[in-house]
Amino acid sequence: LTWAYKNSLDVLFIQEHNGNRDKVSEWKAMCERSGYSIVHGLHNDTTGSGRGAAALLTKMSTFNLTEADSETQPSVGGRIAHKKVLWKDMILNLVSIYVPVNADERRDFLKQQMFNHRKIPAGSIIGGDFNCVENPIFDVVKENGGTYQNKHAGLMKTVMRKKQTSDVFYKLHGNRARAYTRETSEIRTRLDRIYAKDTNSQLVWHSHKLDHTYVNY
């Protein structure tokens, strides 16, 4: 987080954190020491471990936030963290999302989000691990040349269109550009993406950074 602050990162979309309620106070204090507020996604099943998967960190000085803006948000699997912020003269909805890796769970989760306007308002800026790609021709390289199982990617794209957003990477580089956020010896994929309003937006995108790197803290 010290590195993020020094490099002027205003928003961090984090997924698959697996932190439970016992981590809330510790993570809140850690973020605030580095100048960030945190929206900590937690599983809404209070009878279980309360583990979550999504977190959203926003730089307090950029958005005129205070420690009081840190919060926990329950959702199915803790997979969504949402914050409405004011930037310049614009109201921005920021959403961190973790889409399930299991194909059946992915389908059910995406269907639930189709009309979830409270957690994911139309025109949001959505950063997430989607566990499927936009276009397997350009977003996947398999060393063995096999077929990538991109199940329910069409549903994912339908949801993003319903939210009036499109892929920021394609906005910047064109829809035939190649890049990968997760790389192994066998496969490279662009699972991690940012979506933003596709028309009538006052935002100008210059660059963004995504990776699938494990963070230990």
Briefly describe each language-model feature range.
Residues T2-T46, D108-N200:
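Metal-dependent phosphoesterases centered on the DNase I-like endonuclease/exonuclease/phosphatase
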Residues Q15-N93, I97:
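Structured beta-strand-rich core segments of catalytic domains in phosphoester-bond hydrolases
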Residues H17, A68, K83, I97, ...:
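Generic beta-strand hydrophobic packing signal
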Residues T46-R51, Q73-G78, A103, H173-G174, ...:
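A short catalytic or substrate-binding loop motif that flags glycine-/basic-rich loops and adjacent residues
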Residues L65-T72, R107, V204-H208:
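Short, charged, solvent-exposed linker or helix-capping segments at domain edges/interfaces
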Residues K84-D89, S124-G127, I187-T189, R193-Y217:
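Surface polyanion/phosphate-binding segment centered on an Asp-His-Pro turn
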Residues V95-R107:
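Surface-exposed cleft-lining segments at the edges of enzyme active sites
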